[in-house]
Amino acid sequence: MPFSRFRPALSAALAVALLTLVTFRAHGAEATLLNVSYDPTREFYDAYNREFAQYWKGKTGQDVAIRQSHGGSGKQARTVIDGLPADVVTLALAYDIDALAKKGKLLPANWQGRLPHNSSPYTSTIVFLVRKGNPKGIRDWGDLAKPGVQVITPNPKTSGGARWNYLAAWAWAMEQPGATPATAAEFLGRLYRNVPVLDTGARASLTTFAQRGIGDVIITWEN
């Protein structure tokens, strides 16, 4: 029999969330789960889901098929709140998971204390990817705000990765001598005026940079 929906088990960690979810379901011949995740995790979860399906089959004898939905983290959170029947949610920001708890009432408000490391199963740093030979001489955040430099980053209104990019740029600006929130905001303004395209997610931004050839540098996840 298929799994029944267990929406309160939404979590930021697929590995733990799936194990939690299946505890509440009767074993049967088939099962289908939907993992709603953020943009750049498609290949990771495609491989991980196959591993989990093999593990679950060996443990219970039950076949499980895991469907995937990917997009900007903020956009995905709103889609789930609006009714997308997710079994598992893996998003880029605690802020987006909080929205599921506060606006969607889909999990407890204290979800972040439920698992180790504040329920964050993995981390990444932010890196710059430049054109071959780095013709614009981009070395640090300050270079991104220089005239004539095109920067590719997703839209922070829809992408969790873009919000991390924004926060990393803000943190750099606040570490500069004599920095104030006003000078940091001015720096961010100059940086974003150098962004020719604000895609909705990290994958679309990578396509813009790598396939469409737009931009001198892309701000992206290391992993």
Task: Describe each region flagged by the PLM.
Residues 28-103, 113-115, 221:
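Early extracytoplasmic/lumenal segment of secretory-pathway proteins
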Residues 28, 61-63, 123, 146, ...:
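Short, well-ordered coil/turn elements that cap or connect secondary structure elements
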Residues 176-223:
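Ligand-binding pocket segment of bilobal, Venus flytrap-like solute-binding proteins
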